[in-house]
Amino acid sequence: MTPSELRRLYSIVRVLLSYGLDELIPKMRLTFPLRAGRRLLFWLPNRHRNMPLGERLRLALQELGPVWIKFGQMMSTRRDLFPPAIADQLAMLQDKVEPFDGKLAREQIELSMGGIPLEEWFDDFDIKPLASASIAQVHTACLKSTGKEIVIKVIRPDILPVIKADMRLMKRLAGWLPRLLPDGRRLRPREVVLEYEKTLLDELNLLREAANAIQLRRNFENSPMLYVPEIYSDYCSEGMLVMERIYGIPVSDVDALKANGTDMKLLAERGVQVFFTQVFRDSFFHADMHPGNIFISYEHPEDPQYIGIDCGIVGSLNKEDKRYLAENFIAFFNRDYRKVAELHVDSGWVPADTNVADFEFAIRTVCEPIFEKPLAEISFGHVLLNLFNTARRFNMEVQPQLVLLQKTLLYIEGVGRQLYPQLDLWKTAKPFLETWMKRQVGLPAVFRALKEKAPFWAEKLPEVPELFYDGLRQHKMLKHSVDQLAYELKTQQARQGQSRYLLGIGATLLISGTLLLISRVEADMVPAGLMAAGIVTWIIGWRRTR
């Protein structure tokens, strides 16, 4: 470790111990050095003894900074690793920090513009930030060319070295974990950290966020359900994002929404429809839809429209994942646990040699109590959570796209029930899922697939005669090769049969001569002749096997 890494490690240890998080170290022989080391650091007492463990963990991560805050947010979705009290606290982590100097933001913007003075492109730049987070902050301005109001998102100037240093430490810690914990290898800590690093570095590239927002805007163009602000891509770079400024009511401000006359039932149901449309129609979903990234338009409160911002994290599902997921939901709510178990095996999410009967029983044991509640009170997100946690006991591979989906579904469900507590999410989603499933089977689906593949076949059709001729020629050559191989195999088998016969005769003659010699028969030449003939015959047989 470098001196700077050692200093940072000491800083992390100091914060963790000040919140008494050493109690998370399991009491076992392998972890004795860690527990002994804790006693040596006697000058770092637990200063928050009266707080619950989950709250202490949340506060410690917030004190450690952006890398650890976002890691805690991600780990809040892994409820197979933490008890509910800790996972709930991790989900409350707030990604809010003090804004950095507006003059520095101005310098960063001009640097992203290639050194061009900010006034050449923008008017009315507000040096005071509109919003600030751990990765970036936002300033308002107007486009000089059109006068349109915009917001400029700019990456913090000092954030990259901090992130890289903390990620190096996190990887080292992940490498130690399997050696210290008996279950450490199954948890795959290194893979979890590498996945997190990729997500974090993606967020640092605002060109990626711009591309995601453009895609999402195109998917919901002219939609009454969701509006995505326009991105001005000519002004965007890795460190700067420029987009249309929007005005709306934060989705968490229920009182303001009601005061505006918003149809709360329709708004809650539309949130569910937006989510399932993104997942099943578009295979491209906004995976960071927490309340801070969702607003509601002031216009047409009787026909409310969502406004989505911050597309830094997105997810996607392939066709097979979508089909299996939809079938899982439908089978689960029909209480067909056998089907749920078979779908997990068929999809490859759990190993092919999984005992389906045992898996079905485990799913039934965990999920059947859920149906003691009315359907309107059943949580889709917790259904997924229970399914995945049960499947992990049967060696289910971690599916990053499903973890993102589960997290997003929990956000959407929480927001929906905050807006309209009587929201029946299953009743809203079931028609959508059943309609989507019907579109995937039958003649319409076949014709649609043919239409999608038409350009491919139009390109390949002229090559069909040549491919057909090549196939016939290769078939003829293959037949000749097979015949030749069969002949050689038959010859080899015949030679091996003769060899075994000669080896048997040689061994018989050799044994007979030896027995005669031992019995001291008077005709001494007979056993010697038999032994000599046996040796010669055995050698001939052995050579024919080569």
UniProtKB/Swiss-Prot annotation:
Its EC number is 2.7.-.-. GO terms for biological process: regulation of ubiquinone biosynthetic process; ubiquinone biosynthetic process. Residues 124-502 form the Protein kinase domain. It is an enzyme of class 2 (transferase). One of its GO terms (molecular function) is protein kinase activity. ATP binds at residues 130-138, 153. CDD domains: UbiB. The active site is at 288 (proton acceptor). The chain crosses the membrane at residues 499-519, 521-541. InterPro entries: ABC1_dom (IPR004147), Kinase-like_dom_sf (IPR011009), UbiB (IPR010232), UbiB_bact (IPR045308), UbiB_kinase (IPR050154). It is found in: Cell inner membrane. One of its GO terms (cellular component) is plasma membrane. Signal peptide: none annotated. The keyword Hydrolase does not apply. Pathway: Cofactor biosynthesis; ubiquinone biosynthesis [regulation]. Coiled coil: none annotated. It is a multi-pass membrane protein. Keywords: ATP-binding, Cell inner membrane, Cell membrane, Kinase, Membrane, Nucleotide-binding, Transferase, Transmembrane, Transmembrane helix, Ubiquinone biosynthesis. NCBIfam families: PRK04750.1 (NF003404), UbiB (TIGR01982). HAMAP family: UbiB. Is probably a protein kinase regulator of UbiI activity which is involved in aerobic coenzyme Q (ubiquinone) biosynthesis. Belongs to the ABC1 family. UbiB subfamily. This is Probable protein kinase UbiB. It comes from Pectobacterium carotovorum subsp. carotovorum (strain PC1).
